[in-house]
Amino acid sequence: MSKIKVLIVDDSALVRQMLQEMLKSDPEIEVVGTASDPYDAREKVKQLHPDVLTLDVEMPRMDGVTFLKNLMRLHPLPVVMISTLTEKGADITFEALDLGAVDFVAKPKIDLQHTFEDYTDEICRKVKTASKVSKWQLERQYARYVANKESKPKVLSKPGSLVSKVVEKFTTDAIVPKKAPSDFSKPSHKVIALGASTGGTEAIKEVLMRLPSTTPAIVITQHIPASFSLPFAQRMNSVSEMEVTQAEDRQPILAGHVYIAPGDKHLLVERTSSGYICRLNDGPPVNRHKPSVDVMFRTVVQSVGKNAVGVLLTGMGADGAKGMKELQEIGVPTIVQDEKTCVVWGMPGEAVKLGAADYVLPLGSIPEKILALIKK
């Protein structure tokens, strides 16, 4: 089997060296070259024909987003962005994901010794995942970006760690012990529970842009760094008719509102005498993730019951698949994004394997199905 050819683009010689060392440690990956700026990268893409690029977000002469825009227009390639974990870095990274970048990782730190193995594992996994993304998928995402820019959707006037430590593998039970759902005979509000990972920031945007302000409450767990979740919520708030916020502990869950899990806390849904509230939990990662989709889904089973709708979008791994099965087993309708429109059909694919998906739909059909199900 031929190796995945990677071109590293970064203005820092030290970062280029670190990334090269990490990627070369994987027998399935070959680093075919490095470039210090986008002009150098442009020539090396033509010469070396890489399968995947790692691209620094912020560089001199031409920034990573401008280069990515030209690349996706002229020579689409899977790209993993190397991002600084800052508000500015978050904004640039989200624009890169808009353009068609497959995923992102934090820029490696100089004092990486204690987390070197974890970082190496993460970037190698993401490069290998990116290599499976087709040219057609990249072209479709870029066309969607251009269409959204040309349509200039009105921005509504509203207020508005990627390097994980070595952790034990915990199950959902470590955060939310399994128990029978409460009595849901009394009428209560609907809640839509949505989970996503790789490719999810764009998929979530596509869903939220098509839901009216009258939609019931939505709780979202997206795998994302802690410093990125608030900018992500603000970005979603600017394109949605619903009010989108980063969830806060004990925040009431209201219709017409969207609550996004902070990047370093599990989001739980709790039922009170007056309705539902968000609870934030600082327990260990589950399925190697914090926040975890399975954890959120478990609490929706226990607190919302049949008044919920479960949705699982694009993402690497299996987080959310078991939780979706638990939702389905109590009669909650479940929707999974189909393989063709996913960046990575990991989490949705695992849900399908478990028989947990009532509906397997292309991304563009999911908002309509959500609206149909909440009327039942």
From Swiss-Prot:
Pfam families the UniProt entry points to: CheB_methylest, Response_reg
GO molecular function annotation: phosphorelay response regulator activity; protein-glutamate methylesterase activity; protein-glutamine glutaminase activity
Domain CheB-type methylesterase: 185-376
Main subcellular localisation: cytoplasm
Coiled-coil features, chain-numbered ranges: none
Cellular compartments per GO CC: cytoplasm
Role according to the record: Involved in chemotaxis. Part of a chemotaxis signal transduction system that modulates chemotaxis in response to various stimuli. Catalyzes the demethylation of specific methylglutamate residues introduced into the chemoreceptors (methyl-accepting chemotaxis proteins or MCP) by CheR. Also mediates the irreversible deamidation of specific glutamine residues to glutamic acid.
Similarity section: Belongs to the CheB family.
Protein name, per record: Protein-glutamate methylesterase/protein-glutamine glutaminase
Organism, scientific name: Hydrogenovibrio crunogenus (strain DSM 25203 / XCL-2)
The gene coding this protein: cheB
